[in-house]
Amino acid sequence: SAKAVKIESITVDGQNLIIKTTEPNGSLLSSLTEPAFVIMDTADLKDVASKPVLTGPYKITAFKKGETIELAAFADYWGGKLGLDSVTVKDIEDNNKRAMALQSKDVDVIQKVDSANRSLFKDGFNIQDIAGVRVLMLKVNHTEVSPLHDKAVRSAIAHIINYDSMAKIIGNGSTPGAAPFPPSANLGYDAIANKAMTDVAKADQILTQAGYAKNANGMYAKDGKELAVTIAIWGKDTSLYEEIQQELKKAGIAVTLKKLQSPDEVDTLGTDGFDLVERNVVTMSTNDPYWFLSLFYKTGAKANVGGYSNPQVDALIDQLSVTFDQNERSNIAKQAQQILVDDVADIYLLYPSATVVSTTKVKNV
């Protein structure tokens, strides 16, 4: 929205588009590349629901919500002649049905191939695993109603989880998590110190120093109360979280999995409804770190559902919002990441890759 990107007015002067903001906005240009923003001809909106007039190499000729988008090459596209005269995009949400469509050659290219269906395309197909900027993480409840309010508890849990195992369960080129932004974001991943690594002995040491001890049931307890956490999850595939549940139970922490109906419930869950909650987020949807940091880690931000708050992080996010030099922006993001890792602000499980499978006749995807 205009409010989100701090736009006061937009005017046109010949070939110049003049955007006036309400305050300095270092991420303005990046924000305008967000896929949710489009340039649309608003002169005639009678067919906007089925044939909107937009920009780009292809024009929409037909649209059926939840089914298909028919595209035709735009002859006057500034980038020159296109490789295809037309493209049909089919909306197939089910993983198995999508895989079957490619097997039967009803479609030529599919994305979002899960590890269970990957083996179907070993022969006679092209498979590409593309490192993305998405992070699958567990948002932490930092409020006093949760045992994870204690940094020792969240740090111990972060050391118990087997990140290599997490990446293998998801498969398709996924890599183990350890920081807010993946290495592919080019925001100093390798330079971040104290990233969580699997070390159950270290977890035991941390909990022991915090006053926890194992009881007769082999579970950690303090002041007569066993350490137990609730993980709220919403995805269809629960195998990843069942693995975490078993890992924590084996180490001495009881886990209850709380199934949500959709990711939309996360924002309205309330801090009394979880200790950890599943989030799957594109960290650099605009190729800039501001959106992710401000939305998930600024004190009081909507997606900061766990109530994380650190004045240093808030100050860095504020600084990021008014900084225009790209190198400076990257350095600020690196500083914020280091604090988030040191605080165990959240637990970063893995970085999924985008998997694209096509028939052999398709080139240059």
Regions found by a protein language model. Give the residues of each.
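Surface-exposed binding/hinge segments that line
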Residues: 1-41
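Gly/Pro-rich hinge or "lid" segments in bacterial periplasmic/extracellular proteins
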Residues: 24-82, 86, 200, 205
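A structural "hinge/loop" feature
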Residues: 26-38, 139, 357-365
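Ligand-site clamp/hinge motif
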Residues: 46, 74-119, 254
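A bilobed periplasmic-binding-protein/Venus flytrap-type ligand-binding module shared by bacterial periplasmic
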Residues: 72-77, 132-156, 160, 169, ...
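Append "and occasionally in soluble cytosolic enzymes with long acidic Gly/Pro-rich linkers
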Residues: 149-246
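Detector for C-terminal structural segments
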Residues: 160-189, 236-243, 267-365
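Ligand/substrate-recognition segments at binding pockets and active sites
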Residues: 213-284, 354
